[in-house]
Amino acid sequence: HAHEDHTAALPYLRALGYRGPVYATAPTAALVPGFLRKWASYSRNHGDRLPFGEQDLAEVRVTPLPLGTRQVPGLPGLTVTFGRSGHMLGSVWMRFAWERAGSLLYTGDMALEGRLLAADPLPKGEFLILECAYAGSRLAQDAQYRRLLELAAETVAGKGRVLLPVPPRGRGADLLFFLAEKLPQDVPLWAEGEVVDA
């Protein structure tokens, strides 16, 4: 998917000389340039020295693969299956199957309990690379959302305001939808344009 923790090295790969293909889903391919520009601008504004130039950033190309794709061009003997991971628009899990070497399932970031984006069932793989960012958390998403709603309602009742710094796609849109659905109609909700557009 297009989040910086998965795509920010693409301009650096170009700076190192990589000119091969980069494949992604069509939504991810469309979102990557904007995410990269925003991330690079943010990094520079905070004094970071990036290991690539403007031209490397401008020349990043991502080739979209339609959701039913099974054969990746230029990789004979490899079958790729992917399905929606529910994390954000364009995010997928991927299963790679080699004729002679077995199969590998890579989950990427997953959100099995999302309200807006569905996740497809995971297939079996002989080897597994599993995203575990929240592995230490035992609180189910529904319980997290209920707690957030309680805190937001309590704050609003006390004439306070709630600010949620969330990513513009994926969880941010999911939280906005949840709060709009659950909070009383007279409670104003303000959101960054990108969250609303998601």
PLM feature spans:
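His/Asp/Glu-rich metal-coordinating catalytic cores
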Residues: 3-7, 12-188
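Long, charge-dense
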Residues: 190-198
